[in-house]
């Protein structure tokens, strides 16, 4: 989860988020190299009084600065497309959870079970227990098994919402009348916090998301207790 004065991303807890972090570093390095080269050329032009007349109209230079950016864009696009396909791929999910956005709470339905659904509201600040996080705790956490592929179906009952959990690399729009899907898989147990990431009204800031990833045995006991 995030902490005060954090400068980087949250710690990755899923293969998708790890890939996104690597892609971020890859792209940032390319941007840094390009910026350094441009700054060097500008500095060189400002500090020298010499002018090479043949470079003012040289087809070779124009060819280079056309082909080189195209190659750089390809180096950025290829890993980006790979990650996009990974995020959209859904192969034999072990569990399907339907998520509905409301003003201003989330509701969840475990579609593989006959009657397992609940609403998830933010706990008011006045009701928080010691150690709980302000504006992030909910009365009903989404309990899921770790190290298993889970399909999330996301939609909305009223206005646009967005279901996002940064440490898992998840952000899916909840659109009324449309069912979007995404997959998640956590490589470790723990609590993972998120929030609605689409302005949806006056209480938009009070729609937290809490996922509790646990071993399969613990999840089975929890699901039995909820039925």
From Swiss-Prot:
Q: Which GO terms describe its cellular component?
A: mitochondrial inner membrane; respiratory chain complex IV
Q: Name one Pfam family in it.
A: COX2_TM
> What PROSITE patterns does UniProt report for this protein, alphabetically?
COX2, COX2_CUA, COX2_TM
Q: Kindly list the positions annotated as binding Cu cation A1.
A: 161, 196, 200, 207
User: Which reactions appear under catalytic activity for this entry?
Assistant: 4 Fe(II)-[cytochrome c] + O2 + 8 H(+)(in) = 4 Fe(III)-[cytochrome c] + 2 H2O + 4 H(+)(out)
Q: How is the cofactor bound?
A: Binds a dinuclear copper A center per subunit.
Enzyme class comes to translocase
Q: Where does Mg(2+) bind?
A: 198
Q: Which UniProt keywords apply?
A: Copper, Electron transport, Magnesium, Membrane, Metal-binding, Mitochondrion, Mitochondrion inner membrane, Respiratory chain, Translocase, Transmembrane, Transmembrane helix, Transport
Q: Which domain of life is it from?
A: Eukaryota
Where Cu cation A2 binds, per the record, is at 196, 198, 200, 204
- Chain segments annotated as transmembrane: 15-45, 60-87
Q: How does it sit in the membrane?
A: Multi-pass membrane protein
What is this enzyme's EC? 7.1.1.9
User: Belongs to which family?
Assistant: Belongs to the cytochrome c oxidase subunit 2 family.
What biological function has been recorded for the protein in this entry?
Component of the cytochrome c oxidase, the last enzyme in the mitochondrial electron transport chain which drives oxidative phosphorylation. The respiratory chain contains 3 multisubunit complexes succinate dehydrogenase (complex II, CII), ubiquinol-cytochrome c oxidoreductase (cytochrome b-c1 complex, complex III, CIII) and cytochrome c oxidase (complex IV, CIV), that cooperate to transfer electrons derived from NADH and succinate to molecular oxygen, creating an electrochemical gradient over the inner membrane that drives transmembrane transport and the ATP synthase.
PANTHER family in UniProt: CYTOCHROME C OXIDASE SUBUNIT 2, CYTOCHROME C OXIDASE, SUBUNIT II
Indicate the quaternary assembly: Component of the cytochrome c oxidase (complex IV, CIV), a multisubunit enzyme composed of 14 subunits. The complex is composed of a catalytic core of 3 subunits MT-CO1, MT-CO2 and MT-CO3, encoded in the mitochondrial DNA, and 11 supernumerary subunits COX4I, COX5A, COX5B, COX6A, COX6B, COX6C, COX7A, COX7B, COX7C, COX8 and NDUFA4, which are encoded in the nuclear genome.
* Official protein name in the record: Cytochrome c oxidase subunit 2
Q: Which organism is it from?
A: Balaenoptera physalus (Fin whale)
Q: What's the gene? A: MT-CO2
